[in-house]
């Protein structure tokens, strides 16, 4: 009650203080108005006094004096009113100060008497405990027409609390046996296995280590006996972790995944695999599929690959020209080097065959093949050339230089694929091209060292970007231009037809006075057993200038 009275007194003090502040503000406004009137009358009195000095008649002078006296009287009244209002304002300010002081005192008393929220909650609890002595049954007894068998929900809950706590009356909906291995050093628990059990057959054997009303955990030793020694209760976090591990173990799929398998070689990923992959038993079939993907008939190609593996491994000069580069792992490089030899034979154009025939008839220490072997391969090429001519418009290939002989087979192989744009056979374009009469003019410039002599072997230097393209550099280069015989792209494979302005390589060497004279068959094989660079450069030039070579 004291707190309520203090609150009322405080509110009254605040109200009085507010009224006094309003009166003070009104009186100050009135003082401002009185001061304005006072200034106006003073100015008027001075003006009349100044006019009075210039008037000579007596009547006017008397009237001016009376008016001046009235103004002086009003000025005095206004001055007194201003002084009175200022005094009243001072009194009101003092009263306001007094009220503020009383308000502060009341506020201090109120704070000392006022209860906090905790005190209020505590008092409410105490009052509730005091009034709880009244029975619930007595409350419901006052309700008319209530059946005697009715039991309130509160009473039913209180009566059933003891029954619900009984373990025997609770039925398990789901049971699971989890085998857990605990590390005594780190204290971590690992789930080894989890087996669901029928809820009807479950018997709560062992020691209860956890129970939150929804889940119960019993500890049982490995021999299905209760382990009383060293068994402690489990924390909720540990129980949740065990359940999570058990659920993850059950959700794991036994399916084993492997790398994607592509039937079409052109659908394989461009990123090379880092892991070593061993060739499977179906390698011959894969080779057959890859060869068929180029649009050529390769019956008998697998037989040639199998028979030539021992001879061609490490020494064979291979050419691969797929539609795009296909990466291979290191373990597949040897097989990949052997496969494209047949593909290059299928992709050889008719006007390129005469140059290749010279190389096939001559035994080469690099290829390791006998002349009879070369003849067999040539006959196989001739038998397979018609389907190549049929699909010549659709097949696109590139010329790739041979691998160096001293390259380690275990190292990765980098291949360069050079593409050329197809030139359409238009009469207008032929007119624009100066000197074009339907014949390809292939010119080869060979830098040779004639002063050093023939005994010094040529050393191959490799291009920094393409290690498979060889450029032969002698120790001291002396440029001597040589021109290769002109070749018609439509030349037949069985015979050569000479053209005008075509000079053979032998005639060029004789005209230039070269000390070295070779037959057309010997020129193409160097002294060290490697392929003559003129043949390789001529192939590149012909592929670059040909109409149907892309």
Curated annotation (Swiss-Prot):
The modification Phosphothreonine is found at residue 271. Transmembrane segments: none annotated. Phosphorylated. Residues 248-280, 356-393, 463-528 are annotated as: Disordered. It comes from the Eukaryota. Its main location: cytoplasm. It is found in: Cytoplasm; Cell projection, Dendrite; Cell projection, Dendritic spine. InterPro entries: Paralemmin. There is a cross-link at residues 125, 179 (Glycyl lysine isopeptide (Lys-Gly) (interchain with G-Cter in SUMO2)). Residues 2-106 form a coiled coil. One of its GO terms (biological process) is regulation of cell shape. The keyword Coiled coil applies. There is a cross-link at residue 179 (Glycyl lysine isopeptide (Lys-Gly) (interchain with G-Cter in SUMO1)). The modification N-acetylmethionine is found at residue 1. Residues 248-259, 483-494 have a biased composition (Basic and acidic residues). The modification Phosphoserine is found at residues 135, 321, 370, 384-385, 497, 514, 519. The keyword DNA repair does not apply. GO terms for cellular component: cytoplasm; dendritic spine; membrane. Keywords: Acetylation, Cell projection, Coiled coil, Cytoplasm, Isopeptide bond, Phosphoprotein, Synapse, Ubl conjugation. Interacts with GLUL. PANTHER family: PALMDELPHIN. Belongs to the paralemmin family. This is Palmdelphin. It comes from Bos taurus (Bovine). The gene is PALMD.
């Amino acid at each position: 009650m004291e707190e309520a009275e203090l609150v009322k007194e405080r509110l009254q003090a605040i109200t009085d203080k507010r009224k006094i502040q309003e009166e003070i503000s009104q009186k100050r406004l009135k003082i401002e108005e009185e001061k304005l009137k006072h200034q106006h009358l003073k100015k008027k009195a001075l003006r009349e006094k100044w006019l009075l000095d210039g008037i000579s008649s007596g009547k006017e002078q008397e009237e001016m004096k009376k008016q001046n006296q009235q103004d002086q009287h009003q000025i005095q009244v206004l001055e007194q009113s201003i002084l009175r209002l200022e005094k009243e304002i001072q009194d009101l300010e003092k009263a306001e100060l007094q009220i503020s002081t009383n308000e502060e005192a009341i506020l201090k008393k109120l704070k000392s008497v006022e209860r906090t929220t905790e005190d209020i909650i505590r008092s409410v609890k105490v009052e509730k405990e005091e009034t709880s002595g009244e029975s619930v049954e007595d409350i419901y007894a006052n309700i008319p027409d209530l059946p005697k068998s009715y039991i309130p929900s509160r009473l039913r809950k209180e009566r059933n609390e003891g029954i619900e706590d009984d373990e025997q009356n609770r039925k398990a909906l789901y049971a699971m046996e989890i085998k857990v291995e605990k590390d005594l050093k780190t204290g971590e628990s690992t789930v080894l296995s989890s087996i669901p059990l029928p809820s009807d057959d479950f018997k709560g054997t062992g020691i209860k280590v956890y129970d939150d009303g929804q889940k119960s955990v019993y500890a049982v030793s490995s021999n299905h006996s209760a382990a009383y020694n060293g068994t402690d209760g489990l924390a909720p976090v540990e129980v949740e972790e065990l359940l999570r591990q058990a659920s993850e173990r059950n959700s794991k799929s036994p399916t084993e995944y492997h790398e994607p398998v592509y039937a079409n070689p052109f659908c394989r990923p461009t990123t090379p695999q880092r892991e070593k992959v061993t060739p499977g038993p179906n390698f011959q079939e894969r080779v057959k599929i890859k060869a068929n993907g180029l649009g050529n008939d390769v019956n008998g190609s697998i037989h040639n690959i199998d028979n030539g593996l021992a001879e061609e491994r490490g020494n064979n000069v291979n050419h691969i020209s797929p539609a795009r580069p296909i990466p291979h792992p290191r373990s597949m490089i040897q097989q990949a080097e052997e496969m494209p030899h047949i593909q290059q034979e299928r992709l050889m154009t008719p006007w390129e065959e005469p140059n290749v025939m010279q190389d096939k008839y001559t035994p080469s220490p690099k290829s390791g093949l006998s002349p009879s072997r070369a003849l067999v391969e040539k006959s196989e090429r001739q038998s397979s050339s018609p389907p190549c001519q049929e699909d010549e418009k659709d097949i696109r290939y590139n010329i790739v230089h041979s691998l160096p002989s001293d390259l380690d087979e275990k190292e990765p192989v980098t291949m360069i694929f050079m593409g050329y744009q197809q030139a359409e056979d238009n009469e207008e374009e032929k007119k624009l091209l100066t000197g074009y009469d339907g014949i390809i003019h292939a010119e080869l410039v060979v830098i040779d060292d004639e002063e050093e002599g023939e005994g010094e072997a040529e050393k191959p230097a490799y291009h920094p970007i393409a290690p498979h393209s060889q450029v032969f550099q002698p120790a001291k280069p002396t440029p001597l231009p040589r021109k290769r015989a002109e070749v018609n792209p439509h030349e037949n494979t069985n015979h050569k037809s000479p053209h005008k302005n075509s000079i053979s390589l032998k005639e060029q060497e004789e005209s230039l006075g070269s000390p070295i004279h070779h037959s057309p068959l010997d020129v193409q094989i160097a002294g060290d057993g490697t392929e003559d660079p003129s043949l390789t450069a001529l192939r590149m030039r012909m592929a670059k200038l040909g109409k149907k070579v892309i």
